Amino acid sequence: MNNLLSAYVTMLLILLSISGGAIASENCNDTSGVHQKILVCIQNEIAKSETQIRNNISSKSIDYGFPDDFYSKQRLAIHEKCMLYINVGGQRGELLMNQCELSMLQGLDIYIQQYIEDVDNS
């Protein structure tokens, strides 16, 4: 049963990466399909993305018009959207929820970088 679950999670990760969804960095490739290792790796990637976004916003907030609560509101919206995956249940739902949050945070980071670039070039 454990091997079946491990194979399923590995296939899920492969499908997510093929489908163009954000997948945790290459560092997560050595997790060997172990759910807890995959989850921790994705959560570490989420933490890195959060730190990068907060640093970009805080260093640019005055010049670029970011409201004080911009990040917290965006992060809450991401979390609420991704919580839908919990309804899937079990380890699969937990993994999908975390992967969703990582993907959406990476999208938010790209959006913020583009916003800053647009303001700089206007």
Curated annotation (Swiss-Prot):
Keywords of the record: Disulfide bond, Signal
Molecular function as annotated in GO: identical protein binding
The keyword Signal is annotated on this UniProt entry: yes
Free-text disruption phenotype from the record: Deletion mutant is susceptible to killing by V52 strain in a VgrG3-dependent manner.
Effect of residue 92 to A: Greatly reduces VgrG3 binding affinity
Residue stretches in coiled coil: none
Leader sequence residues: 1-24
Disulfide bonds: 28-41, 82-100
Source organism, top-level taxon: Bacteria
InterPro entries assigned: TsiV3, TsiV3_sf
Oligomeric form and interacting partners: Homodimer; dimerization is critical for inhibitory activity. Forms a heterotetramer with VgrG3 composed of one TsiV3 homodimer and two VgrG3 molecules.
Biological function: Immunity protein that plays a role in preventing early activation of toxin VgrG3.
This protein's name: Antitoxin protein TsiV3
Organism of derivation: Vibrio cholerae serotype O1 (strain ATCC 39315 / El Tor Inaba N16961)
Gene name, Swiss-Prot/TrEMBL: tsiV3
